[in-house]
Amino acid sequence: MYAVFQSGGKQHRVSEGQVVRLEKLEVATGETVEFDSVLMIVNGEDVKIGAPVVAGGKVVAEVVAHGRGDKVKIVKFRRRKHSRKQQGHRQWFTEVKITGIQA
């Protein structure tokens, strides 16, 4: 059984027991989070597709940790001008463990 849900402007395909990194959520570590915007639920041959979301569909997860991703380097270079600009970015994330999928 797996589900596709939306969080932080992105869609995630998950199954029970899976650990997923999402955009940062303002929830404390160890708390439970419910995602109501479930787009699709598949249980063997039974497929439920929402228009746009599945009615009564829910993905339940437990917050495992918060952190920051790897550094992404941004470089702006102007040729022949002896000019260069360097910048870095580390995106915040929340790691959750999927504990249940309800149809």
UniProtKB/Swiss-Prot annotation:
InterPro entries assigned: bL21-like, bL21-like_sf, Ribosomal_bL21, Ribosomal_bL21_CS
Pfam short name (any one): Ribosomal_L21p
GO cellular component: cytoplasm; ribonucleoprotein complex; ribosome
Keywords: Ribonucleoprotein, Ribosomal protein, RNA-binding, rRNA-binding
GO MF annotation: an example: rRNA binding
One of the GO BP terms on file: translation
Family under the similarity heading: Belongs to the bacterial ribosomal protein bL21 family.
NCBIfam families referenced in this protein's UniProt entry, alphabetically: L21
Function noted in UniProt: This protein binds to 23S rRNA in the presence of protein L20.
Oligomeric form and interacting partners: Part of the 50S ribosomal subunit. Contacts protein L20.
PANTHER family the UniProt entry points to: 50S RIBOSOMAL PROTEIN L21, LARGE RIBOSOMAL SUBUNIT PROTEIN BL21M
Protein name, entry field: Large ribosomal subunit protein bL21
Source organism: Pasteurella multocida (strain Pm70)
